[in-house]
Amino acid sequence: VAVADKTLAELDYWKSRRSAEGRLANHWYERAFTEPFGLKREFFDAKRVLDIGCGPRGSLEWADNAAVRVGLDPLADLYRELGTDQHKMSYLSAPCERIPAPDGSFDIVSTLNSIDHVDDIDACIKEIKRAVRVGGTILLMTDLHEEPTPTEPVVCSWDLLDRFRPECIAVFVRHLEKVHKGNGHESVFAGVHYDHTNPATRYGILVALLQRLV
């Protein structure tokens, strides 16, 4: 997928959502960042948090207990017209493959429904591991689908977590069915375990909490 086409598709999607919603909602993000990973809000106390592929909704607006809350998105500058300039969280306009931050800058790095949107997943994972401090946490949630789409050019599989080794270890992993169309968070909240004995081709959702060891 050409970069320009992908950018246009992403921006068109968010403009259509704003038209449909009036104002882009973000009320479910606290739950999305905590419940699926077995965490409480207090886990984010005084933490430096980076959300990869944050989009324009304000994914970290809820986290006013964090020391630093930054959203990274290659379209962050364009999202100002969608209202991000009114948010309290900070934004960095850059791709995951080139995170503009020193090594170990963050206590928590999250990628919720974004790692399949990148252009180079191996470069992205390398950067995520670099940006999180030793002992820090990576929160990962992603759709697993059979075919690429204009905005999701990367096809991930259940063995995705192997790519985070040897620096990181998976502490908590869930394989879930995608039981709701559209908003993947609703399927995660539903928590239906993925039946690997069912041979039917379908979406799945991988949820994992990883820790950087070295």
Language-model features: locations:
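Conserved class I S-adenosyl-L-methionine
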Residues: 139-164
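A short glycine-rich, Lys/Arg-flanked "PGG" loop and its adjoining helix->strand segment in the class I
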Residues: 122-134
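Conserved alpha-helix/loop element of class I SAM-dependent methyltransferases that forms part
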Residues: 26-47
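Core SAM-dependent methyltransferase catalytic element
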Residues: 182-214
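A short acidic, Gly/Pro-enriched loop at the edge of an enzyme's catalytic core
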Residues: 94-109
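N-terminal, positively charged/glycine-rich alpha-helical extensions of SAM-dependent methyltransferases
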Residues: 1-25
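A short SAM/SAH-binding and catalytic strip from SAM-dependent methyltransferases
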Residues: 108-119
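Class I SAM-dependent methyltransferase SAM/SAH-binding core
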Residues: 50, 54-98
